[in-house]
Amino acid sequence: MPTINQLIRYGRTSVKKKTKSPALRGNPQKRGVCVRVSTMTPKKPNSALRKIARVKLSNGIEVTCYIPGEGHNLQEHSNVLVRGGRVKDLPGVRYKIIRGTLDAAGVEGRKQGRSKYGTKKPKA
């Protein structure tokens, strides 16, 4: 408990909020180039081969990104747009690739939730 004198001299220090996506440096998205595209197994109760990409961002930082949706066309040297957002069962994966922009094509045959996977409206 500070004294009145201490409060006058130093004031109260505000708690700094720690960012969940530090590599983006406060930007909503960042462009990057795929260095490696591979798969990864999730944490304990789950079992799968999750698609991930190691991406070198335009600010020089290298991050591991998740590739959402079924199937993808990404390979080494593909240009991608990266956004924040972790994958709960993949440790160390704190970013996602935005589908439907740059070299990342949208998910084929997607009918619902298309905007999240960069899929165009199907012809009726």
Curated annotation (Swiss-Prot):
Lineage: superkingdom: Bacteria
A family per Pfam: Ribosom_S12_S23
Entry keywords, A to Z: Methylation, Ribonucleoprotein, Ribosomal protein, RNA-binding, rRNA-binding, tRNA-binding
Modified residues (3-methylthioaspartic acid): 89
InterPro entries, sorted: NA-bd_OB-fold, Ribosomal_uS12, Ribosomal_uS12_bac
Transmembrane segments: none
Cellular component annotations (GO), alphabetically ordered: small ribosomal subunit
GO biological process, one term: translation
Gene Ontology MF terms in the entry: rRNA binding; structural constituent of ribosome; tRNA binding
Assembly mode: Part of the 30S ribosomal subunit. Contacts proteins S8 and S17. May interact with IF1 in the 30S initiation complex.
NCBIfam families: rpsL_bact
Similarity annotation: Belongs to the universal ribosomal protein uS12 family.
Function text: With S4 and S5 plays an important role in translational accuracy. Interacts with and stabilizes bases of the 16S rRNA that are involved in tRNA selection in the A site and with the mRNA backbone. Located at the interface of the 30S and 50S subunits, it traverses the body of the 30S subunit contacting proteins on the other side and probably holding the rRNA structure together. The combined cluster of proteins S8, S12 and S17 appears to hold together the shoulder and platform of the 30S subunit.
Protein name, per record: Small ribosomal subunit protein uS12
